[in-house]
A protein has these predicted regions:
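Amphipathic alpha-helical coiled-coil segments
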Residues: 24, 56-74
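Generic N-terminal initiation segments characterized by hydrophobic and/or small/turn-forming residues
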Residues: 14-17, 28, 64, 75
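Short, charge/polar-rich alpha-helical segments
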Residues: 8-21
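Short, charge-rich amphipathic alpha-helices with coiled-coil/heptad character
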Residues: 1-9
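Residue-identity detector for glutamine
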Residues: 5-6, 24, 33, 72-73, ...
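Amphipathic alpha-helical interaction modules
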Residues: 18-40, 49
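Short, glycine/alanine-rich amphipathic alpha-helical segment
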Residues: 42-63
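Long amphipathic alpha-helical coiled-coil segments
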Residues: 38-42, 67-92
Length: 92
């Protein structure tokens, strides 16, 4: 695989990771809404299980955020190491 193809694939993966993180954030918001609704409803099953799920999803978002940052750094290092600025913009 050529260097530019690798860079394009890394950029695609970064977009997908960011999309996944956004999806997880949406899940967390929905969980919070269910937890709030259950305050009025008072179902013990939900009281017992939802906080654990909330914690797991929140932890997953943090892990995903770290992964995105680390992979972005990997991508940037690859870009610099392979001098791809000269290939992408020959006037540079």
């Amino acid at each position: 695989m050529e260097k530019l193809q690798q860079l394009d694939l890394m950029d695609k993966i970064l977009r997908e990771l960011d999309d996944l993180k956004n999806s997880q954030t949406s899940v967390l918001k929905k969980l919070a809404q269910i937890e709030a609704d259950n305050i009025n409803l008072g179902v013990a099953l939900l009281d017992d299980k939802l906080p654990d799920i909330h914690t797991e999803v929140d932890s997953s978002i943090e892990i995903m955020g770290t992964l995105v940052e680390e992979f972005q750094q990997h991508r940037d290092n690859f870009y610099t190491k392979n001098n791809l600025v000269a290939v992408q913009d020959p006037t540079a």
